[in-house]
Amino acid sequence: MPAKGVVDMTELSNLVAESLERLRRDKPLVQCLTNIVVANFTANVLLSAGAVPAMVDNPEESEGFASIADGVLVNTGTPYRETTEAMIAAARGAASSNTPWVLDPVGVGMSWRTRVVLDTLDVAAPAVIRANASEVLALAGTGASSRGPEAGDAVEDALASATQLVRHYGCVVAISGPVDHILDADRHVTVSSGHEWMTRVTGVGCSLGALTAAFAGIQNDHLIAAVSATAMLCVVAERAAERSAGPGAFAQALVDELFLVSPDEVGERGGLRDVTA
């Protein structure tokens, strides 16, 4: 990628397409420590995209499995004491083997859950933090308690906090919203594709965290990985909505379109834009 302030959109679109081609070829193994509401949908999203899910979320196996996985997702949507131990163990295993892991801090801002997230971050910094604006604000200590996926803070209000997290953890931060913002220390890209029904189906946002971990497993530039995952899910959401009567059919069509969409269409239709300051 070019230096700060010179993100070439043609090159970026090509890198997104190439990343999807590589994902489908290499079939990265993704360990998912995710919430009980979305586990099945998340696994199907990964399979249809071309990755291999492994829902290994117990403390006895998590650390060892993270060391052999290509990418790891830690999602705090429904934390229990045993699974929180597994999350910390997975972060430790990922760090010891340089496996990229993605944090999706669902509901951060509630006291115990925030402590779990911070304890996990103390073990190892993630490759990517994927969250909504309210979660970014809460994680940075600049917002109130989170309502999780239903939180209503504007993405633009969380950009300063996202920059703070980027600097503190040395990671990429991807903020989901009507327009997604993805930034690291040098670059800031937006993705403006997608469809409103993405918020009407349980698990779409959580599956984006898993998809980001899959791309991070095959793409060393983690900003490109996050942009690729976001663009892919948003483009297939548009395609799925075009042939669906409502959210139920949309959820099924979304899984189909992840399998059917071409890499070039993801790169070209993603609505990518450089907004690096």
Swiss-Prot record:
The keyword Metal-binding applies. Disulfide bonds: none annotated. One of its GO terms (biological process) is thiamine diphosphate biosynthetic process. Substrate binds at M55, G203. The keyword ATP-binding applies. CDD domains: THZ_kinase. It comes from the Bacteria. Its EC number is 2.7.1.50. It is an enzyme of class 2 (transferase). It catalyses: 5-(2-hydroxyethyl)-4-methylthiazole + ATP = 4-methyl-5-(2-phosphooxyethyl)-thiazole + ADP + H(+). One of its GO terms (molecular function) is magnesium ion binding. It holds the Pfam family HK. ATP binds at R130, S176. Keywords: ATP-binding, Kinase, Magnesium, Metal-binding, Nucleotide-binding, Thiamine biosynthesis, Transferase. Pathway: Cofactor biosynthesis; thiamine diphosphate biosynthesis; 4-methyl-5-(2-phosphoethyl)-thiazole from 5-(2-hydroxyethyl)-4-methylthiazole: step 1/1. Its cofactor is Mg(2+). Belongs to the Thz kinase family. Catalyzes the phosphorylation of the hydroxyl group of 4-methyl-5-beta-hydroxyethylthiazole (THZ). This is Hydroxyethylthiazole kinase. It comes from Cutibacterium acnes (strain DSM 16379 / KPA171202) (Propionibacterium acnes).
